[in-house]
Amino acid sequence: MFLKAVVLTLSLVAVTGAQAEVSANQVATVVWDYFSQLSNNAKEAVEHLQKSELTQQLNALFQDKIGQVNTYTDNLQKKLVPFATELHERLRKDSEKLKEEIRKELEELRARLLPHADEVSRKIGDNMHELQQRLGPYAEELRTQVNTHAERLRNQLTAHAQSLETTLRQNVDNLQASLTPYADELKAKIDQNVEELKGHLTPYADELKVKIDQNVEDLRRSLAPYAQDVQEKLNHQLEGLAFQMKKNAEELKAKISANADELRQKLVPVAEVVRGKLRDNTEELQKSLAELSSHLDRQVEEFRRNVGPYGETFNKALLQQVEELRQKLGPYAGDVEDHLSFLEKDLRDKVNSFFSTLEEKENQDMLVAVPELQLTPVPLES
């Protein structure tokens, strides 16, 4: 049942709090996914939307999954579960209201922009062209970096596998002692190289967010002369556009990271298999090492093929979102189901605010809890 998956995710988020900062984005995603799932499943919504029942199940699962982990986790549970439950209730109640507000906002915007419809459409088209020019080099650079670092990863791991084969031929009489360090080092190299791969590729998403902000600001300035009486409404629509575009950037980052982690998960077991066969005869071990090299090639090549096109796909998605804005502001838009992105943006803003307040309070409490240093006077010798 989806509800149990949501509760489990919230529990895991809280458990990791002792080792790392709890992510507001994680909690917002859990609540939003839960809301979206229930919105698409009327029967489950009827069964599980009551606040009291949701709170009860969340608290019960916290107790079942984490028990007495530490004071921080216990405190987080007490604050997070009621907050998440209340936020979900507000989402449900605000959805239709916000939908109507966005409909009226777009109607007023269209009416004000109608006398300048052709100019507005041209300005947005120019902005799309500028966006394409800005993002094009990033897509090409991402593909180049994927190819470069994937090839580097392949070369380093293949070289280590070849060292294993060489050592095998030179130390037939003492395989386990000679090869064990190499097998252990191979696993460490896989972890290290995959982390370096992620480190080189994931920053692209943050750079793209800067370009998105620049492009949306350019669009706002170009449309401002046509929306003098409704500038606030135009700004609101552009905020929604920027949110959607940045969400795509976050998804790009997550997809790159997930593919790198998947690559690691496929490579590490093979290294462990080789280590496990050190007690086997030489022929079996040679066969395993030969399979290791080909397996490394296949998995790295698969990663390269999967991740390489992500930049172009990302660019197309952003251009489509700007085109959708042009259609929404045009005279023939009709009804547009646009409120959900604004609802999600509002949700994430509230979660970020909640976590900022919680973090500030935790820091203040820690300062208060630190006892003052007291010096015990030492009697002077007479």
Curated annotation (Swiss-Prot):
GO cellular component assignments: chylomicron; extracellular vesicle; high-density lipoprotein particle; low-density lipoprotein particle; very-low-density lipoprotein particle
N-terminal signal peptide: 1-20
Key words, A-Z: Chylomicron, HDL, Lipid transport, Phosphoprotein, Repeat, Secreted, Signal, Transport
Sequence repeats: 33-54, 60-81, 82-103, 115-136, 137-158, 159-180, 181-202, 203-224, 225-246, 247-268, 269-286, 287-308, 309-330
One of the protein's GO biological processes: cholesterol metabolic process
Gene3D superfamilies in the record: Apolipoprotein (1.20.120.20)
13 X 22 AA approximate tandem repeats, as annotated region: 33-330
Subcellular location: Secreted
Maturation and modification: Phosphorylation sites are present in the extracellular medium.
Main subcellular location: secreted
Superkingdom of the organism of origin: Eukaryota
GO terms assigned for molecular function: cholesterol transfer activity; phosphatidylcholine-sterol O-acyltransferase activator activity; phospholipid binding
Family statement: Belongs to the apolipoprotein A1/A4/E family.
Role played: May have a role in chylomicrons and VLDL secretion and catabolism. Required for efficient activation of lipoprotein lipase by ApoC-II; potent activator of LCAT. Apoa-IV is a major component of HDL and chylomicrons.
Domain remark in the UniProt entry: Nine of the thirteen 22-amino acid tandem repeats (each 22-mer is actually a tandem array of two, A and B, related 11-mers) occurring in this sequence are predicted to be highly alpha-helical, and many of these helices are amphipathic. They may therefore serve as lipid-binding domains with lecithin:cholesterol acyltransferase (LCAT) activating abilities.
Subunit structure: Homodimer.
Name recorded for this polypeptide: Apolipoprotein A-IV
Organism field: Neomonachus schauinslandi (Hawaiian monk seal)
Name of encoding gene: APOA4
